[in-house]
Amino acid sequence: MAARKMITASVTAATALVAVLATGTPAQAKTTKFCGPPAAFTLGCFYSEGDYFTVQDMRADGKRGVLKWQTDYGRKGECHDANGANNPPTKCDYDFKEGHTVLFQTAVRNGANGADEGLSNPMIAWISGR
């Protein structure tokens, strides 16, 4: 009798395990848009599908919005929005290596080479769109 209960329990457990493994999990949607903090003076986003940034100056102070970026493999650069505050964002297109990360943050500058002001917290994004 005890052996029969043990076999029944084992078969039930095995059946449950097969059911769980056969069902699988739903595919996860990949994230393709990574944006910085919404309260920043300059808004910045990275779009992993297309490898581009957008940067938008949100403060009417005569200064420009700047997005600074650096990949985990050493490449770096900047994207500038000098078309005035509250206008459509500036798009900067790049071609990055897939499967890496990019760190970016935004700032406000007086001219292209001015000192960074109002530097946002850094954001990290997957270049591969995971």
Where are these regions (language model features)?
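N-terminal prepro-regions of secreted/extracellular proteins
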Residues: M1-L43
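Post-signal peptide N-terminal regions of Sec-secreted extracellular proteins
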Residues: Q28-R130
